Amino acid sequence: MASVTSVPKTGRSVNQDVPATTLTLQTRPTPAPNFDEGEHLIRVHATALCAGELYWHTYVTFTKEETVPGPDVAGTVVLAPPSSPFKPGDDVYCRIPYSRAGGARDHTIALTSELARKPKNLTWEEAATVPLSALTAWQALFDQSGLWEGPEDERVKGKRVAVTAASGAVGMWILQFARIAGFDAVIGTCGDGNEDFVKSMGATDAVNYKTTSLTAWAAEKQGRKADLVIDCFGGKSLADAWGCVKDGGVLISMVGYPEQEKPAGLEVKDVKSHFFIMEPRGDQLQKVTELVEQGKCSFLMDSVYPLEQFQEATDKVESRRVRGKVVLKVL
């Protein structure tokens, strides 16, 4: 284990002045891990920002004194509990819950249950784009859909899945996982110019929502409706998703509550619908690592900024005019 004396007493940290959304770069004490709680001290190499995270304090009770953005972290273990499978010097990545300080600082804290080994074929910045998006996609498809509870040979055989905002950071991961899982058809909605990208990620059909709604597309030909529809955008997109789900199908959203967006007068039978929030799962992220290292999945990175340019990076994320993740290079 690395010596405690090798850990600097202070470090750079981008802190949010809650309840405001103001961010400042400060010099703060290096966090001390509690080994009894499975905490590891991580030297952060890169962190990815998330749109809307500066407003999460209105929904989440923070368990730490500091509010630091950057839920996606890629870094090196500095200190670890004696029983941890992750040792000092290990290259790891993870998703940190919004209730704790994130990765926009020199050192941060991560739990054993959150960590996975960083893919060897990704740079630090590339690895930081993966955890939040990939885990959200994984849990939507494999945990929340209910399709994996039956006999193995019947789970996806002949099944169709539709994904809204399929060219986005989460949607593109769902497409890849659905392709690997063997769905009979994978439908993805996207805007102008993204059709080829969506198909390259695994979609059998790309629907340009600016010219054709998902509801209209599904109604054009018999058999186009999906057994599973996953919404990654909310609002009108979620309302439109109702028109594409089969009777007896499943509609999931990670953005809003499907029943609140259900169009008035729409007749659907026995559709199971729900909203979910992903949970940090190192065991699932490790499976993603294996897929990435095998060349079966790819990432999507928009841009990289040094930590000192945190405000420019944040402004870009909040503009929503990005394609992929915006990353802060910390080390």
Curated annotation (Swiss-Prot):
Protein's UniProt name: Probable zinc-binding oxidoreductase, mitochondrial
Biased composition (Polar residues): 1-29
Record-listed E.C. numbers: 1.-.-.-
Pfam families per record: ADH_N, ADH_zinc_N_2
PROSITE patterns: CBM20
Chain positions covered by the region annotation Disordered: 1-34
Localization in the cell: Mitochondrion
NAD as UniProt keyword: no
One Gene Ontology MF term: oxidoreductase activity
Coiled-coil spans in chain: none
